Amino acid sequence: KQGQRGWKLYSWHAPETECIAKGKAAKPYEFGVKVSLTTTNRRCKGGQFILHTKSLPGLPYDGHTLAEVLEETQALTGREIERAYVDKGYVGHKAPKPLRVFRSGQKRGVHGQIKKELRRRSAIEAVIGHCKSDGHLDRNYLKGRQGDQINAVMSAVGYNFRLILKWLKALLCKIIAAMWAQM
């Protein structure tokens, strides 16, 4: 990264490492590459599936990445996205016009159902936490920019597989309980 005194090197073994300023008191900086995760906003019985993930090298501004990420999510799911709920970093986004984007903490144009759905936006924070801790998104052992992209995708795939396995385990328990009840 170009600093005041030249290029900064944050890691000898991974020169593509970047410093991401989080602005939090406990952990003000994170080192690595930005990753974008997209989930549904609906409450799901088994948990929220990750629909799209992408590593964003070069520290792009969040608002500039929104249009591309939503377009790729629409292509993957085959469904038109009507509303997007994002965090406060997406001020000045460049999303296409028919799509409505609501930021957390926004007051204008927020009422009724949208207010409920906007409160639901914070549910993705748990998904991000599980991907970082269980899915090894916090530490990447793969090399280069391509390794960053593969790590982000594999973390999301692993998270989705864990949800499916949890659902299959519950289904198997119900089947076994029904078989025991008949005996």
Segments predicted by a language model, with ranges:
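Polybasic low-complexity intrinsically disordered regions
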Residues: 1-82, 86-88, 95
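Short loop/turn segments at secondary-structure transitions that flank enzyme active sites
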Residues: 18, 43, 107, 160-163
